[in-house]
């Protein structure tokens, strides 16, 4: 599989939690790519890729809309980017 990179702005975000605990399981971002902002890309990432717990809280509360993001990973069969690298800026 090829590695894929998307750079753009966060349009929407949410945090999915494990059913058996209150620990975050996955962060999901809708990203508007710089080159094609109407072609939204869904980025899924483990919380461990976030720089700090503040980002986790802000993404879960939708406080990061419009923030720049760069994500690198592989496209899964659904067309979502499974991120292995994530760079977030405020």
Where are these regions (language model features)?
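OB-fold and OB-like single-stranded nucleic-acid-recognition modules
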Residues: 1-90
